């Protein structure tokens, strides 16, 4: 690494960005069961199991309310076809609440397969690192003391922007994982709503929202792949321009590309919901 402070400051900011981007790539290929050593998952599974008892109680409640609202009289309940329909609904809902964890993990694995297919098709095993062009390093190192004073301000502002954007992006990806845990933990309660016809929309909305959270990973991967292609073709540097202008134009274009990626990651949930009509 160069001994120049300006170059070091910019390179450190880019290293932070690259490390966070690599961390995102690693997180998106992980399962909730193995995330952070699996300790969080064990607690979530215990909470899920504890809430199953409440889910069974709500299942009976939703079932009774559904029967009362959908049947005009007790005579309708005694009809074989109607009684069979009610029994099948109750049995299916009981199975969904009992095996809700397996159902949700199966859905997650299916969508994770979509993410893996996108990675393999694009030929990306990891993200492309963003590096400082040699032209800028040489130009900055050739600067005198007074010429480098404006560069300090430019690199401080640019480095701060890049660092803040990297943390905003990684927080969004961690937020997705936390939502996966939240959905998994409370799953027995909304899934029990399938027992009654009037309340079944609660369960449908829950499963749609969970699928949308899972699909966010595929959108983030696509955004990272597009950014990596941008990073492989760095901004054009004009060697005849002043050093401050050269560095400022490079940082400005780089931050713009980063803003596009951060915006895509931050709005991945909204994009998925618009695609799925949620």
Predicted segments, located by residue:
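Hydrophobic alpha-helical transmembrane segments
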Residues: 53-65, 157-163, 180
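Alpha-helical membrane-interface segments at transmembrane helix boundaries
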Residues: 44-52, 84-88, 92, 141, ...
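Non-cytosolic segments of integral membrane proteins
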Residues: 94-186, 220, 224-277
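Alpha-helical transmembrane segments and their helix-start/interface "positive-inside/aromatic belt" motifs
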Residues: 1-10, 80-100, 203-213
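Alpha-helical transmembrane segments
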Residues: 191-208, 240, 271-275
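Binding/recognition "hotspot" determinant
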Residues: 1-58
């Amino acid at each position: 690494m160069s001994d120049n402070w300006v170059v070091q400051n910019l390179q450190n900011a880019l290293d932070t960005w690259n490390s966070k981007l690599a961390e995102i790539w690693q997180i998106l290929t992980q399962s909730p069961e193995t995330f952070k050593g699996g300790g969080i998952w064990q607690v979530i599974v215990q909470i899920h199991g504890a809430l199953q008892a409440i889910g069974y109680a709500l299942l009976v409640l939703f079932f009774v309310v559904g029967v009362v609202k959908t049947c005009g009289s007790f005579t309708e309940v005694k009809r074989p076809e109607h009684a069979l329909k009610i029994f099948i609904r109750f049995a299916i809902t009981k199975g969904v609440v009992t095996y809700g964890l397996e159902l949700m993990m199966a859905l997650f694995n299916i969508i994770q397969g979509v993410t893996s297919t996108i990675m393999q098709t694009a030929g990306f095993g990891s993200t492309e690192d963003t590096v400082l062009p040699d032209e800028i390093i040489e130009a900055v190192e050739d600067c005198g003391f007074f010429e480098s004073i404006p560069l300090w301000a430019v690199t401080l502002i640019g480095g701060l922007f890049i660092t803040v954007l990297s943390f905003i992006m990684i927080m969004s990806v961690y937020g997705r994982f936390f939502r996966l845990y939240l959905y998994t933990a409370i799953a027995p309660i909304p899934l029990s709503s399938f027992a009654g016809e009037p309340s079944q929309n609660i369960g449908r909305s829950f499963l749609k929202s969970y699928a949308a959270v899972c699909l966010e990973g595929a959108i983030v991967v696509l955004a990272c792949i597009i950014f990596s292609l941008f990073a492989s073709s760095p901004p054009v540097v004009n060697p005849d321009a002043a050093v401050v202008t050269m560095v400022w134009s490079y940082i400005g274009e780089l931050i713009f590309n980063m803003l596009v990626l951060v915006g895509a990651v931050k709005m991945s949930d909204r994009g998925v919901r618009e695609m799925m009509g949620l």
